[in-house]
């Protein structure tokens, strides 16, 4: 009755008389107990008071509203009672069914059924008859006013495959307890708990007393099936089987439940598991780092797995020529390190000892010497240019003498007009980017000092003069290209089961994307950088030293470290037979370290070249992903946080060029690791568009209230969508009302994108479920090029539908190249549809929280509930008005 509060002095009198009338009428019984009832004589009561007619009318209206609310509450209460009764009846039905199945199984196996009769002494005097759920529900709801169709079924954010109940035969209720159970909530719950406890005690006593009979039945070949059924009966809660993980065919017919993982909250289930992992991590302190899960009690998989052995992972640090030369088929898990650029001095040595026959093709000659990228023109060879700074004087003399062979002279007769455009491009690369031609791995940075310049100053002057003769002006503004980062070695990261169909995150993801880019001709238009492994020092900018050693070198390198300091206490045996750090993320000591270091190192190299101005932008086709990895926690297929490590390296290496870095994360999952890495850094802006479902979607973080801490408050901007399927219209609304205004206010010097494509259409609900088009990712990429002088680098994160992610990546690279207007061209539906109500509520919350940190968000509420086409028209009209006003001011 809060609406009766007023400044009028007559209101307390009315309230007191209403309370007296309410107490005189009493309270209703049953469902109406405890709920006050408005007296029916309210009109007469109001007439006795000295109130004005208008106030009386207001009070009558309020009384009618109160009665309506009262009836609504009563209706909700009755429906809630019905739902609770149905739920309790279903629990009772499940418990009785399990008990009957256990009894029938033991009778068929020859076990004394008296062991179970102790647990069911309260239920029936003999074998329990099968219980029909439909009949029980009918009896339960027969006395209520509601019906079954009014019951609401709670929806879950993931698609679950519930085991179907076996068909039951109808039977007459032979026990009075069956109808008495649902009388009250407390009786039902306590009795059900008692039955479960008795069932557990009986199972334990049965295992102790019948160990001898179990041994005999194992000899007869019946022990495996009995243990499987017993494990099913003991498990009260089992993880449902989800589509991305298939059960082995040998076990698919035996049961339809999946093994309960150590952490029941998995990425493929789209459930938050960070708190559960931290709790389990604390409980398992002091355990051995290599410990196998016993399969006898808590596993439904009966296959065996070989013992975890130390592999020859040290080969990743050996030179290529020291590695065994056997075939890859004999060594399936041997991973070769990614080669850097060819050693130019070694190339000239091979060049010096080469006996070039007369008439050999010049292209093949240069290919042998590994010099074709910068010495493929007869005009350059005729000049007899010396390669200063590359070899000693003897090598240069040998090269000069070899350049005067008749084979080169015959090739020099070719017309120079055929090479004019190629000459310009190569001279441009030599003069403006000569320092990038010799790159060494971070482990050999000490040797890089001898390669500071590929050409001496005198040779550069000769090259410049030659360029001027060919019509190329080196003072003109160069046209930079888009960089691509890719190495096929990253695809070798796989589970030891060697069956990619068991894992949604596999090497085929980057292979399909690279094939798509090659087919569309984008690889030929871009510059592919050399993949490099990240150094341990670079990885330790985000991750701890022990964590880096564990996952970048080998777990065996941490045997002497205190067990409490290890990032992982034990490995898990996955349902596929492989080894994992959790039920989602597999680990292979022969391939994981190399792939993880290559992924981080490739992104660092690509971003460094963009920051230095040698590339205009870039796309890193890398795996494994990284935005879930925290400082000491591998999670969600991620080992090292590639984007976070790269941002730290850019801050340290280029403090002026990359003073402010913006990280845009459009993966459908929140990048918990990236946000934590810069939670208190005001120089790094982290913005994420992701599915949240009020914390019920993996990893459960990224709510609208997570805004950073300390000096970084306001620099973590989360757009967590909940409820409903998001499409282009919802992402466009978020982009124009939140992302672009904040980016414009932040004025970043460099932009990194966690480009996960699992929000693209084609993904199952458990892995995303949104319906974003590939063109939308191209549109967002094109918009980002308007900031930070176009210094934008995309890093592949998630995305598991191969067709969707390859199409989305192709749109992004096409937008980065900038030669086609088709990149990011949205369809009519995307431009003319309004965002749904769930997205509107989310964006309103984000603007309300962050407009105190970003004044540009003020007034953006009006732009939420509009279509993209309407917003563009309004924006165009405003721009035209501003231009007219500017022209008028200039004329005056």
Swiss-Prot record:
Keywords carried by this UniProt record: Chromatin regulator, Hydrolase, Nucleus, Repressor, Transcription, Transcription regulation
GO MF annotation list: histone deacetylase activity; histone deacetylase activity, hydrolytic mechanism
SUPFAM superfamilies noted in UniProt: Arginase/deacetylase (SSF52768)
Chain spans, region Disordered: 145-225
Top-rank taxon: Eukaryota
E.C. number: 3.5.1.98
Catalytic activity entry: N(6)-acetyl-L-lysyl-[histone] + H2O = L-lysyl-[histone] + acetate
Pfam families named in the record: Hist_deacetyl
Chief location: nucleus
Bias (Polar residues) ranges: 171-192, 208-222
Keyword Repressor: yes
Subcellular locations according to the entry: Nucleus
Annotated family: Belongs to the histone deacetylase family. HD type 2 subfamily.
Record function comment: Responsible for the deacetylation of lysine residues on the N-terminal part of the core histones (H2A, H2B, H3 and H4). Histone deacetylation gives a tag for epigenetic repression and plays an important role in transcriptional regulation, cell cycle progression and developmental events. Histone deacetylases act via the formation of large multiprotein complexes.
Protein's UniProt name: Histone deacetylase 4
Provenance organism: Caenorhabditis briggsae
Lineage of the species this protein comes from: Eukaryota, Metazoa, Ecdysozoa, Nematoda, Chromadorea
Gene: hda-4
């Amino acid at each position: 009755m809060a609406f009766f509060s007023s400044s009028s002095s007559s209101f307390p009198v009315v309230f007191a008389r209403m309370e007296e009338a309410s107490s005189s009428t009493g309270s209703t019984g049953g469902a109406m107990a405890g709920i006050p009832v408005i007296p029916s004589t309210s009109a007469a009561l109001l007439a006795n008071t000295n109130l004005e007619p208008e106030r009386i009318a207001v009070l009558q209206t309020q009384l009618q509203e109160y009665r309506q609310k009262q009836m609504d509450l009563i209706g909700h209460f009755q429906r809630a009672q019905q739902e609770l009764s149905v739920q309790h009846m279903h629990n009772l039905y499940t418990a009785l069914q399990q008990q009957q199945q256990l009894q029938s199984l033991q009778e068929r196996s020859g076990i004394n059924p008296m062991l179970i009769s102790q647990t069911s002494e309260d239920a029936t005097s003999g074998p329990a008859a099968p219980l029909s759920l439909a009949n029980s529900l009918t009896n339960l709801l027969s006395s209520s006013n509601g019906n079954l169709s009014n019951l609401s079924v709670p929806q879950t954010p993931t698609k679950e495959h519930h085991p179907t109940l076996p068909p039951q035969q109808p039977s007459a209720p032979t026990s009075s307890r069956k109808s008495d159970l649902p009388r009250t909530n407390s009786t039902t719950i306590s009795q059900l708990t008692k039955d479960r406890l008795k069932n557990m005690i009986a199972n334990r006593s049965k295992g102790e007393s019948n160990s001898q009979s179990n041994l005999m039945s194992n000899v007869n070949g019946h022990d495996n099936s009995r243990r499987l059924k017993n494990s099913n009966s003991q498990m009260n809660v089992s993880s449902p089987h989800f589509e991305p993980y298939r059960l082995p065919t040998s076990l698919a017919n035996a049961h339809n439940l999946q093994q309960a993982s150590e952490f029941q909250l998995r990425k493929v289930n789209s459930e938050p598991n960070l708190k559960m992992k931290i709790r389990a991590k604390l409980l398992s302190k002091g355990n051995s780092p290599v410990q196998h899960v016993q399969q006898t009690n808590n596993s439904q998989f009966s296959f065996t797995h070989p013992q975890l052995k130390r592999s020859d992972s040290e080969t990743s640090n050996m030179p290529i020529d020291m590695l065994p030369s056997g075939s890859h088929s004999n060594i399936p898990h041997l991973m070769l390190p990614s080669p850097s650029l060819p050693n130019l001095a070694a190339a000239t040595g091979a060049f010096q000892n080469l006996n070039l026959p007369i008439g050999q093709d010049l292209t093949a000659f240069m290919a042998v010497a590994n010099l074709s990228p910068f010495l493929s023109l007869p005009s350059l060879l005729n000049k007899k240019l010396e390669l200063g700074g590359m070899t000693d004087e003897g090598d240069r003399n040998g090269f000069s003498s070899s350049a005067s062979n008749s084979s080169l002279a015959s090739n020099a007769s070719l017309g120079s007009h055929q090479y004019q455009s190629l000459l310009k491009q190569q001279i441009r690369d030599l003069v403006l980017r000569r320092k990038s031609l010799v790159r060494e791995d971070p482990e050999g940075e000490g040797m890089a000092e001898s390669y500071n310049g590929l050409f001496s100053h005198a040779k550069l002057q000769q090259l410049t003069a030659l360029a001027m003769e060919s019509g190329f002006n080196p003072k003109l503004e160069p046209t930079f290209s888009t960089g691509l980062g890719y190495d096929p070695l990253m695809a070798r990261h796989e589970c030891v089961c060697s069956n990619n169909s068991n894992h949604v995150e596999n090497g085929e993801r980057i292979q399909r994307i690279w094939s798509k880019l090659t087919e569309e001709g984008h690889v030929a238009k871009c510059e592919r950088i050399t993949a490099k492994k990240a150094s341990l020092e670079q990885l330790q900018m985000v991750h701890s030293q022990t964590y880096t050693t564990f996952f970048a070198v080998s777990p065996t390198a941490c045997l002497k470290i205190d067990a409490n300091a290890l990032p992982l206490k034990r490995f898990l045996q996955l349902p596929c037979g492989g080894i994992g750090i959790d039920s989602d993320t597999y680990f292979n000591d022969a391939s994981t370290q190399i792939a993880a270091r290559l992924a981080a190192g490739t992104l660092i190299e690509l971003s460094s070249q963009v920051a230095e101005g040698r590339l205009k932008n870039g796309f890193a086709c890398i795996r494994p992903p990284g935005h879930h990895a925290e400082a000491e926690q591998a999670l969600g297929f991620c080992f090292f946080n590639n984007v976070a490590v790269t941002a730290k390296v850019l801050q340290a290496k280029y403090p002026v060029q990359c003073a402010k870095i913006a990280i845009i994360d459009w993966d459908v999952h929140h990048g918990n690791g990236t946000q934590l890495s810069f939670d208190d850094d005001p120089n790094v802006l982290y913005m994420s568009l992701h599915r949240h479902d009020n914390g019920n979607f993996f990893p459960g973080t990224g709510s609208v209230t997570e805004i950073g801490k300390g000096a970084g408050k306001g620099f973590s901007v989360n757009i967590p969508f909940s409820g409903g399927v998001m499409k282009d219209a919802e992402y466009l609304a978020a982009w124009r009302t939140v992302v672009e205004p904040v980016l414009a206010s932040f004025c970043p010097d460099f932009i990194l994108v966690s480009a996960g494509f699992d929000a693209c259409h084609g993904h199952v609900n458990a892995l995303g479920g949104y319906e974003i088009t590939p063109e939308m990712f191209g549109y967002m990429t094109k918009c980002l090029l308007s900031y930070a002088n176009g210094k934008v680098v995309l890093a592949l994160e998630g995305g598991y539908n191969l067709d969707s992610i390859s199409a989305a990546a192709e749109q992004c690279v096409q937008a980065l190249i900038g030669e086609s207007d088709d990149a990011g061209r949205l369809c009519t539906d995307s431009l003319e549809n309004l965002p749904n109500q769930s997205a509107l509520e989310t964006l309103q919350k984000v603007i309300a929280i962050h407009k105190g940190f970003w004044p540009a968000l003020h007034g953006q509420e009006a732009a939420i509930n509009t279509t993209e086409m309407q917003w563009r028209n309004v924006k165009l009209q405003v721009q035209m008005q501003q231009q007219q006003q500017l022209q008028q001011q200039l004329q005056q």
